[in-house]
Amino acid sequence: MQTLKVSDVSLIYPGHHKGAPVTALKGVNLEVKSGDFVVALGASGCGKTTLLNLMAGFMAPSAGQITLGDRPVAGPGAERGVVFQKHALLPWLNVIDNVEFGLKLQGVDARTRRERAVKNLALVGLQDFHKHMIYHLSGGMQQRVGIARALTCDPAMLLMDEPMAALDALTRETVQELLLQIWQQTDKMYFFITHSVEEALFLGSRLIVMSPRPGRITHTYELDFNRRFLAEGNARAIKSSPDFIEMREQILGIIYGDERAGEQEKIHA
């Protein structure tokens, strides 16, 4: 079992034009283990994406440490796949060549690349679109290609930064359900960022709520709505259930309370 640990991590940005430094994250502690689906929620500017970038190795913390297994995270690595809000696919390549691209950069042989790509395109329901060009696909299908590409490199962890933010409501629900089915079939660590409380509750096995800057984890919830969906198959019934609605209102109260507190701090600063 793999574990990614965030240990007392802080990040401070230097001030611009002789301005004061900005503390984006302060004293963040988090563990993500194989099979976890951790969702981060919080107001804009609370440091969710900053935390993901640190976990991905795109940035280094100002204090504290991030480790994967017994090794420090010192930069990007194939063991951590990233899916962005904008898909970052290569428009001059067709679907299957996009999915194979990461493995090609790693020097993996053509037969192995193709086998893995075919497997993961089937996993995201795109087994009939291998030769289609990216610009011929809908937004939801493009994001599914991005997920397949990340999975094809067989990372221990999948980091997802609001991958459904630009999708329409119906497509978003479809991709959410697909993502849970993939989670059920793969023993990986998932870290997912969203601004949607409903999405966070539906997807996460654990939900962390972050405070306004400096970002800290203020609340943690263990959830089972995702497992209920996988067992029952009725997303609408789960999202309209009394316990789901009660939890949603509780989380909204926390986030809106934090936003108001942050606004008051700015007013009195």
Curated annotation (Swiss-Prot):
Pfam families (UniProt xref): ABC_tran
EC number: 7.6.2.7
Binding, ATP: 42-49
Record annotation: effect of changing residue 74 to T: In strain: DSM 65
Effect recorded for residue 264 to R: In strain: DSM 65
Keyword Cell membrane set for record: yes
GO CC, any one term: plasma membrane
SMART domains listed in its UniProt record: AAA
Gene Ontology molecular-function annotations: ABC-type taurine transporter transporter activity; ATP binding; ATP hydrolysis activity
Domain annotation ABC transporter: ranges: 4-237
Key words, A-Z: ATP-binding, Cell inner membrane, Cell membrane, Membrane, Nucleotide-binding, Translocase, Transport
Cell compartments where the protein resides: Cell inner membrane
Membrane topology label: Peripheral membrane protein
Enzyme type, top EC level: translocase
Result when mutating residue 79 to D: In strain: DSM 65
Reactions it catalyzes: taurine(out) + ATP + H2O = taurine(in) + ADP + phosphate + H(+)
Translocase as UniProt keyword: yes
UniProt-listed InterPro entries: AAA+_ATPase (IPR003593), ABC_transporter-like_ATP-bd (IPR003439), ABC_transporter-like_CS (IPR017871), ABC_transporter_ATP-bind (IPR050166), P-loop_NTPase (IPR027417)
Subunit comment: The complex is composed of two ATP-binding proteins (TauB), two transmembrane proteins (TauC) and a solute-binding protein (TauA).
Family under the similarity heading: Belongs to the ABC transporter superfamily. Taurine importer (TC 3.A.1.17.1) family.
General function of this protein: Part of the ABC transporter complex TauABC involved in taurine import. Responsible for energy coupling to the transport system.
Protein name stated in the entry: Taurine import ATP-binding protein TauB
Organismal lineage: Bacteria, Pseudomonadati, Pseudomonadota, Alphaproteobacteria, Rhodobacterales
